[in-house]
Amino acid sequence: MTSWRDYWNQDTPIYSGERHKLLHYKLVANDIVGLVPSPEAVVLDYGCGEALFADQVAARCAKLYLSDAAPLVRERLQARFGGNERIAALAPEQVADIPDASVDLIVVNSLLQYLSLDELRSLLKLWRAKLKSGGRLVVADVIPPDVSPITDAKALLSFAWHGGFLKSALAGLARTAFSEYRRIREEIGLAQYSEEEVFDILQDAGFKPERAPRNLGHNQARMTFIGHVSDPAES
């Protein structure tokens, strides 16, 4: 296994158990629902993972595109949501077929750390093309340079304490310490960005950047950014 894409195309130990997984996806779905601008909105969740509660997001918008690079994940999305006319599960290369300037909101949660800078810049160009004037790109769970695995572990344990899965979270952290995740993280690494770096990257891609007051999900040591597409009517 030589890439993060290969790693995610399988059942992984990243979740300590079913309760952890459910609470994670529920929290993210609730956060995304809060970002949907209107019932008529078109939304793209890029790098969505299994998106267990995507139907709740779809109920708040007109169309929800779910895109993930892992074939196994897409199979599960199709099995779970194939009968929902508001939801379409796409491979990353199919996102290019979405009409330009047709999307109101793009959410990219916990993906940047697995991309090279060149990959990120290429995707930003794609996302910018798909967004309408006045649309927003929300890039979440960005890891700052000063956040360590220990900080992430503390955030998980706090989430587990409040979510009622502390015992399984402790066991999960022990498993992760000896898992492929740790080996790949050491060999390939995770991309980390400062706030200033993210602002520069978003501006270079044609967005007006903003730091969100809180991160999507449970880990508030990480960052969420909003890239605004200027609306000529507001100029």
Indicate where each model-derived feature is located.
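Conserved beta-strand/loop positions that form the S-adenosyl-L-methionine
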Residues: Y46
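Class I (Rossmann-like) S-adenosyl-L-methionine-dependent methyltransferase catalytic domain
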Residues: M1-V36, E40, E50-E85, A91-D97, ...
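Short catalytic micro-motifs in class I SAM-dependent methyltransferases
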Residues: S110-L111
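A short glycine-rich, Lys/Arg-flanked "PGG" loop and its adjoining helix->strand segment in the class I
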Residues: R121-S133
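A conserved beta-strand element that flanks and buttresses the S-adenosyl-L-methionine
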Residues: V107
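Structural signature of beta-strand start/N-cap positions in the alpha/beta core
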Residues: V42, K63, S102-D104
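Helix-capping/helix-break motifs at membrane-protein junctions
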Residues: S116-L117
